[in-house]
Regions:
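Flavin-dependent oxidoreductase catalytic cores
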Residues: 1-179
Length: 179
C-alpha cells in the first residue's frame, strides 16, 4: 500500500509537469527508519545488517523510478549519519548510495539525524563533509545541506568538491533575495 501510494504520487508529478523529484529518506521518516539500526529492529530480511536494512528503501525507489521517465532526474535525500555511535554510519550511507546508483538514482541530497536524540555540533555547512564523502565514493551529483546561509560558503563548497548543489530552505527565508 505504501509503495503503491509513492508510485501514484510519482505518476501525478509527471502528469502535472514536474521536472525532477526527490524521495525524502532522511530525518526519521520511513526510508530513514528502515536504514537506521536505531529504528529498525526487525529480525527478518528487512532488518539486521545494512544490506537488509536498505532492502525496502531500494524496492521503493526502484518502483518509483520505474514510474518516472528515464529522461527526468530522480534523487533521494538520505542521512549521511544518525549522529549516534549506534546509528547509521557514513559507511552505511555510502553503501546505500552505491546501491541507489545501481538502480538509477540521479542525485543525492545528504542530510543527517532524526533517528536519535543526538545533538550534533552545528554551524554553517556542518553536514557538508557527509555530502563530500558520499559524492566521492559514488561519483553521483550530490547536494549539501545544513545552515548554508551565506552564498560565499555555498560557492566554496561547490568549488572545493564537497558537493555539486546546495539545498536552501531557511537560508531563503532569512534572505529572500539571496544572490
Amino acid at each position: 500500500k505504501v509503495t503503491r501510494a509513492h508510485t501514484e504520487a510519482v505518476q501525478r508529478c509527471e502528469r502535472i509537469g514536474f521536472d525532477a523529484i526527490e524521495l525524502h529518506g532522511a530525518h526519521g521518516y520511513l526510508v530513514s527508519s528502515f536504514l537506521s539500526p536505531l529504528a529498525n529492529r526487525r529480525e527478518d530480511e528487512y532488518g539486521g545488517d545494512i544490506i537488509n536494512r536498505m532492502r525496502y528503501p531500494l524496492e521503493l525507489f526502484t518502483k518509483m523510478r520505474d514510474a518516472w521517465p528515464d529522461k527526468k532526474p530522480m534523487g533521494v535525500r538520505f542521512n549521511g549519519t544518525d549522529w549516534d555511535d549506534q546509528g547509521l554510519t557514513t559507511e552505511d550511507a555510502i553503501t546505500f548510495g552505491k546501491a541507489l546508483k545501481d538502480v538509477g538514482c540521479d542525485f543525492f541530497d545528504i542530510s543527517g539525524g532524526g533517528n536519535s536524540m543526538a545533538r550534533p555540533q552545528v554551524g554553517p555547512g556542518y553536514q557538508a563533509h557527509l555530502a563530500k564523502a558520499v559524492k566521492h565514493a559514488t561519483n553521483i551529483p550530490t547536494m549539501a545541506v545544513g545552515m548554508i546561509r551565506d552564498p560565499r560558503l555555498a560557492e566554496k563548497l561547490i568549488a572545493d568538491g564537497s558537493c555539486d548543489m546546495i539545498a536552501l530552505a531557511r537560508g531563503l527565508l532569512y534572505e529572500p533575495r539571496w544572490p
